[in-house]
Design a protein with these regions (language model features):
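Active-site beta3 strand of CheY-like receiver
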Residues: 48-59, 81
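Short amphipathic alpha-helix used as the core "switch/output" element in two-component signaling
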Residues: 43, 65-77
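Acidic, metal-coordinating helix/loop segments flanking the phosphotransfer/catalytic sites
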Residues: 34-52
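Receiver (REC) domain switch/output surface
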Residues: 113-125
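Conserved phosphotransfer microenvironments
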Residues: 55-69, 87
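Alpha4 helix (beta4-alpha4-beta5 surface) of REC/receiver domains from two-component response regulators
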Residues: 66, 84-105, 111, 115
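Acidic phosphotransfer microenvironment of two-component signaling modules
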Residues: 15, 36-40, 111
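Two-component/phosphorelay signaling modules centered on CheY-like receiver
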Residues: 14-33
Length: 125
């Protein structure tokens, strides 16, 4: 395992999925703060701004895009990787593209997720 100083705020409401993704990211050498709700995510973001936000396409009953946009108002320039099922709403895909959000569809094998995270972190805004 290679250790990196890059930090990730992981926002996934499902505890089982959150734990699996956190474990994969930590195994990839990332410093991960894993939370299950938007309120806690805001608190953690303000305490220690991460290098990357990874968020599911839905958090509780809130679209992940809306939650990520809200978090980005708290930390402008925050890199965002949304993970989840395929998005079939062209307007949402266009808004995500304009915002610079990245998307990674499930299933997300650990090695592929780690590679995508590295790619997003290496990108310049």
């Amino acid at each position: 395992m290679t250790t990196t100083s890059k930090s990730i705020l992981l926002l996934i409401s499902d505890a089982v999925v959150r734990s699996a993704v956190r474990d994969a990211l930590e195994h990839g050498g990332y410093l991960v703060t894993a939370v299950g709700d938007l309120g806690t995510a805001v608190d953690r973001l303000m305490e220690s701004p991460p290098d990357l936000l990874i968020i599911r396409s839905y958090i509780e009953d809130i679209p992940g895009y809306d939650a990520a946009t809200y978090l980005r108002t708290r930390q402008p320039g925050l890199k965002v990787l949304m993970i989840g099922g395929l998005i079939d709403d062209d307007r949402l895909v266009n808004r995500m593209t304009l915002e610079g959000f990245e998307f990674f569809p499930k299933p997300y094998p650990a090695a592929a997720l780690i590679e995508k995270v590295k790619e997003v972190l290496d990108k310049r805004h």
